[in-house]
Amino acid sequence: MAVTKLVLVRHGESQWNKENRFTGWYDVDLSEKGVSEAKAAGKLLKEEGFSFDFAYTSVLKRAIHTLWNVLDELDQAWLPVEKSWKLNERHYGALQGLNKAETAEKYGDEQVKQWRRGFAVTPPELTKDDERYPGHDPRYAKLSEKELPLTESLALTIDRVIPYWNDTILPRMKSGERVIIAAHGNSLRALVKYLDNMSEDEILELNIPTGVPLVYEFDENFKPLKHYYLGNADEIAAKAAAVANQGKAK
């Protein structure tokens, strides 16, 4: 049976991950640790014999630079790449820039957990005159006002990620090309929920660690057979737990 593999990588630690701030569509770069995580992901993929024909990423530099570092380690810096806002992190609305632990102290751990992980829960909206509104950013100049979020739930993130998967990424895989996606915690959670047919309760508890390759294997009908992280299982579990704990009061 022919098996097709897909590799997903959440960007390495960003400067705002390090500072425990809600990031969303704010274009913050990788921290030094994040660069190291991205390089380590590339080395792991090389050791496991992976190479690719095409890459996808968002229009945010923490994902783009993660992909650069991964491909550099694979000696595939030349690889064609498509960047799409549809793979951006979920938009965190008026929470963007706020410290997660301080927000939890103000509103409670459970409220922040729902804002971070709830399926249909949207954080407080931005206003269009807010400098954080994506309509002020030239990279989104071709998007309609309807497409520009003031805030997003995971459900709304799914509404942009999954059509992009079905219309753009999956057809390329079906043509026989080997694909890697470097994206974000919530855009990848959106895809994982869809691929694994997870319930809303199950997705609430899913935390994707930074800079760890997640491999999906598909059968000839492109139904997922299994998935697994590359790397040390204990270290990966600890990183996922750290992601979960970011939204708790100190």
Swiss-Prot record:
Q: Would the keyword Isomerase turn up in this protein's UniProt record?
A: yes
Question: Is Isomerase a UniProt keyword of this protein?
Answer: yes
EC number from the UniProt entry = 5.4.2.11
Catalytic residues, chain numbering: 11 (tele-phosphohistidine intermediate), 89 (proton donor/acceptor)
What is the top EC class of this enzyme, as a single word? isomerase
The superkingdom of the source organism is Bacteria
Q: Kindly state which reaction or reactions the protein catalyses.
A: (2R)-2-phosphoglycerate = (2R)-3-phosphoglycerate
For this protein, the record's PROSITE patterns field holds: PG_MUTASE
One GO term under biological process is:
gluconeogenesis
Q: Where is this site: Transition state stabilizer?
A: 184
Q: Which SUPFAM superfamilies does this chain map to?
A: Phosphoglycerate mutase-like
- Gene Ontology molecular function terms on file: phosphoglycerate mutase activity
Q: Which UniProt keywords apply?
A: Gluconeogenesis, Glycolysis, Isomerase
Pathway per the UniProt entry: Carbohydrate degradation; glycolysis; pyruvate from D-glyceraldehyde 3-phosphate: step 3/5
Q: Provide the residue positions that the database annotates as binding substrate.
A: 10-17, 23-24, 62, 89-92, 100, 116-117, 185-186
Q: Which Gene3D superfamilies match?
A: Phosphoglycerate mutase-like (3.40.50.1240)
Q: Which InterPro entries match?
A: His_Pase_superF_clade-1, His_PPase_superfam, PG/BPGM_mutase_AS, Phosphogly_mut1
Q: Which family does it belong to?
A: Belongs to the phosphoglycerate mutase family. BPG-dependent PGAM subfamily.
Relate the assembly described in the record: Homodimer.
Q: What does this protein do?
A: Catalyzes the interconversion of 2-phosphoglycerate and 3-phosphoglycerate.
Spell out the protein name for this chain. Answer: 2,3-bisphosphoglycerate-dependent phosphoglycerate mutase
Source species, please? Salmonella typhimurium (strain LT2 / SGSC1412 / ATCC 700720)
Its taxonomic path starts at: Bacteria, Pseudomonadati, Pseudomonadota, Gammaproteobacteria, Enterobacterales
- The gene it comes from is gpmA
